[in-house]
């Protein structure tokens, strides 16, 4: 409260006036600030009011803003996942209806089957519509590219052009929850079997990135400082920090050793200096020994294959370091692929989605050129680098009938290019378990004579081969015989040779082999036998082996000297679309076995859809949990911020009343102290 300054017994009136004004102004300032606080509800109006509390409030503001953004993201994510769940529920109902129809038609008549096929076709149309539905984020089956329609209809097949993986967003601890589904969702799927069978084994080049090396220790390659010496002399250092390519490493090593030669007055390097040889760094040393060392705690020289063989340093007899195992990349030059053995590439034939493409790879300079050539022209396939980055894989995008399946074969005069690249779909190394969309080949084995209890070869024969003159060769296959195409061909040739020899016939009458150009297993008979008639195949003991090997649907050629099997190693997309198409086709063709097979595969699709929906349900639960967690966090942060920032209205109201009283008292005292009396006019 303003008061008369008792410290001054005698003072000028101006001093009293200024003192009173100062006290009144101070009270007014405090009233003004408190008035602003009451109007805004804030205790801190500017950072300078309390820097410590202001810093804490600023941090809380940022956290609350971030959390609110997360809650918005979670809201969109929940909507997308909810749409996914509903679509998968509809797909489950659809596949249940299809499975019910399939089961009811196993013992039905042709007319009913044909009418039910129309219903299956309508279910396929419904599935096509479901697969292209959108949520707030985009197409739910588009994978990491939801802006593009994931399933397109292409020449009778349903082609998945979506991406691998799902779209993710900042969702707190649920950030790894995909908001869309891509490959592996039971609806969007690619084929998975065509894995390259040849290790292309790229050589080291100057342009090879250090990040594309597995390194001598198979742990990658680090950069840093390494040491070296010549003939046990002075040790010098070379800094490889910042090197990006193998060429960078070679240049720095060359420069360091040349400087070493000048400083030590010695000759270390030959004309080729540092270079690459196959997968290793190579050093041209006419004489003497060059050794490299790692400094303590480092593995740079070891990673580069310069020290792993310390017992034998670099010299004229040991110019190469340890192989650095370069990875296969799209920029790998064709000339660097040791797996090709230096053989030039030619052409391949690719059949997919009921279309045939002859692809010329002779002009390819890099692996990316091969990828572009194979994927161009609407072939409906994707070329991928294998997980171990040593070979290439090819997958088809089109889910259709068997006639739409993928096969890759050679072209006459094409130089066995498909086999060179390891992408021929039917080769000697192809597993018979991969035949018939993965159903494999079944044989009769282990049947015994009911009287003797011994295994009877006659009861285990799978099929007979009838030559042009009527001579019959019995083929009894074992489990070992049906491992690969090569083991099957070897078993047939061995049994045929034995039976021909026992009958006093030349073994040249018959032979089996893998087709050199076209995909198929070939049975050959001599021209003389071909004049008598074509090669015939007859299943025995109800064995399905001949049918599953494609021999029953084989084609004759070469004036009846050749029987080439149907290609049963084609590659298909096994998803709900292909299974429904198979069922529709089987119903239209009155194919009981096909209906049974489609029913079995629909059961697999049911499991996939159920599993996908369960997974999406788990995602939804995680999103709900994260929403609750973030909401709790916002409430807590807002409570803490309120304690730091907001005004205590009760205390502020009391203080406001006190300041009003103080102002009133100050004004009163000032008025009284400034009153004039008679004494003011006495001289």
Question: What name fits each language-model region?
Answer:
Residues 168-170, 176-178, 282, 382-384, ...:
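Structured core elements
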Residues 135, 230-232, 261-353, 386-447, ...:
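Acidic, small/polar residue-enriched beta-strand/turn segments
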Residues 250-252, 279-280, 300, 369-376, ...:
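Extended non-catalytic domains of envelope/secretory-pathway proteins
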Residues 89, 96, 167, 173-251, ...:
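Threonine/glycine-rich low-complexity segments that form extended coil/beta-edge repetitive scaffolds
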Residues 2, 135-195:
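Short terminal interaction segments
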Residues 1-152, 244, 248, 255-263, ...:
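Amphipathic alpha-helical polymerization modules
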């Amino acid at each position: 409260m303003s008061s008369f300054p008792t410290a001054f017994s005698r003072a000028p009136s101006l001093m009293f006036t200024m003192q009173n004004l100062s006290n009144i102004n101070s009270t007014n300032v405090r009233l003004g600030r408190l008035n602003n606080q009451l109007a805004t509800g804030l205790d801190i109006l500017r950072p300078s009011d309390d820097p410590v509390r202001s810093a804490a409030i600023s941090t809380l503001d940022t956290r609350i803003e971030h959390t609110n953004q997360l809650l918005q993201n979670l809201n969109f994510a929940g909507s997308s996942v909810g749409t996914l769940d509903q679509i998968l529920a509809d797909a489950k109902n659809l596949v249940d209806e299809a499975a019910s129809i399939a089961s009811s038609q196993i013992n039905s008549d042709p007319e009913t089957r044909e009418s039910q096929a129309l219903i299956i076709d309508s279910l396929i149309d419904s599935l096509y519509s479901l697969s292209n539905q959108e949520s707030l984020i985009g197409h739910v089956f588009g994978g990491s590219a939801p802006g593009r329609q994931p399933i397109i209809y292409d020449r009778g097949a349903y082609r998945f052009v979506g991406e691998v993986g799902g779209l993710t967003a900042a969702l707190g601890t649920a950030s790894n929850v995909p908001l869309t589904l891509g490959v592996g969702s039971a609806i969007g799927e690619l084929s998975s079997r065509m894995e390259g069978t040849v290790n292309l084994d790229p050589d080291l080049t100057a342009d090879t990135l250090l990040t594309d090396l597995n390194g001598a220790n198979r742990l990658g390659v680090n950069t840093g400082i390494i040491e070296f010496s010549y003939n046990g002399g002075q040790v010098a250092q070379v800094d490889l920090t910042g090197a990006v390519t193998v060429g960078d490493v070679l240049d720095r090593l060359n420069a360091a050793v040349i400087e070493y030669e000048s400083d030590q007055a010695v000759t270390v390097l030959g004309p080729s200096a540092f270079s690459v040889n196959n997968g290793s760094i190579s050093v041209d040393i006419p004489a003497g020994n060059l050794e490299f060392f790692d400094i303590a705690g480092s593995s740079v020289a070891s990673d580069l294959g310069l020290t792993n063989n310390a017992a034998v340093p670099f010299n004229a007899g040991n110019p190469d370091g340890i192989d650095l195992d370069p990875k296969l990349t799209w920029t790998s030059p064709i000339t660097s692929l040791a797996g090709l053995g230096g053989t030039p590439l030619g052409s391949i034939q690719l059949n997919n989605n009921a279309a045939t493409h002859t692809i010329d790879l002779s002009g390819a300079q890099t692996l990316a050129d091969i990828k572009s050539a194979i994927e161009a022209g609407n072939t409906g396939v994707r070329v991928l680098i294998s997980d171990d980055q040593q070979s290439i894989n090819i997958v088809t995008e089109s889910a259709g009938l068997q006639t739409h399946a993928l096969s890759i074969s050679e072209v006459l005069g094409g130089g066995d290019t498909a086999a060179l690249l390891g992408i021929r779909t039917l080769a000697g190394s192809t597993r018979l378990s991969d035949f018939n969309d993965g159903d494999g080949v079944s044989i009769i084995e282990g049947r015994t004579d009911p009287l003797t209890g011994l295994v009877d070869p006659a009861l285990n024969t799978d099929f007979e081969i009838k030559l042009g003159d009527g001579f019959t060769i019995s083929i009894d296959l074992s489990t070992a015989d049906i491992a690969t195409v090569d083991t099957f061909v070897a078993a047939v040739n061995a049994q045929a040779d034995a039976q021909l020899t026992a009958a006093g016939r030349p073994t040249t009458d018959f032979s089996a082999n893998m087709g050199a150009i076209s995909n198929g297993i070939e049975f050959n008979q001599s021209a003389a036998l071909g004049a008598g008639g074509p090669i015939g195949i007859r299943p025995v003991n109800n064995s399905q082996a001949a049918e599953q090997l494609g021999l029953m649907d084989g084609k004759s050629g070469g004036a009846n000297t050749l029987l080439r099997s149907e290609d049963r190693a084609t590659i298909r997309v096994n998803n709900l679309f292909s299974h429904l198409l198979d069922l529709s086709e089987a119903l239209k063709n009155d194919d009981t076995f096909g209906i049974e097979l489609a029913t079995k595969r629909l059961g697999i699709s049911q499991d996939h859809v159920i599993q996908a929906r369960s997974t999406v349900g788990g995602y939804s639960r995680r999103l709900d949990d994260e929403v609750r967690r973030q909401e709790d966090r916002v409430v807590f942060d807002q409570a803490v911020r309120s304690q730091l920032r907001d005004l205590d209205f009760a205390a502020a109201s009391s203080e406001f009343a006190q300041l009003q009283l103080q102002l009133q008292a100050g004004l009163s005292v000032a008025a009284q102290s400034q009153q004039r009396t008679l004494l003011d006019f006495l001289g």
